[in-house]
């Protein structure tokens, strides 16, 4: 009798242990499933936020690229020394030194790619494209620094030193200006050399903007498929 009772107790205890273990395993499975679901939802939210940033960057880049590319063509027209009327020369000379700032802010991309970032994206292909995109944005910023330096060290100095700045400002503000000053500036060989330097920098700068715009469009498509 005692042996039978002991056997029953052992079977009962074993059954209880099995049930407890199964309960723990099920709880762990549910917990893992919840963790995965939360992680997946967080990733989708992050990608949605990333998509918004990319669209904003794309729109900004497009405006800046079109403006700077148009100005680049104007510089080329000036350097090619195509015959122009005095009125056309004044219009051209008033725009040669201009450019539109194009360095973009991308905090979400920076956060995603940060080595210490807790916001992870599991898609390695997307991460690879984001790294390429970040490099492209950095290239724009670097070339923009070069063109800023040229403006600060060469263009503004030349215009001030030769008293052309006031005529340009007056023309831009639609006030009285000396058109002969502007024609003289248009024909100035030193200024033409400075603008040629601007073209060299701006050509690479605009190219990087074009590349970044194309790459941004590509990554937008990738994020919208998620």
Predicted regions and their residues:
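Long, hydrophobic alpha-helical segments that serve as membrane-spanning/inserting helices
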Residues: 1-11, 32-226
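Hydrophobic membrane-insertion alpha-helices, especially the h-region
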Residues: 14-29
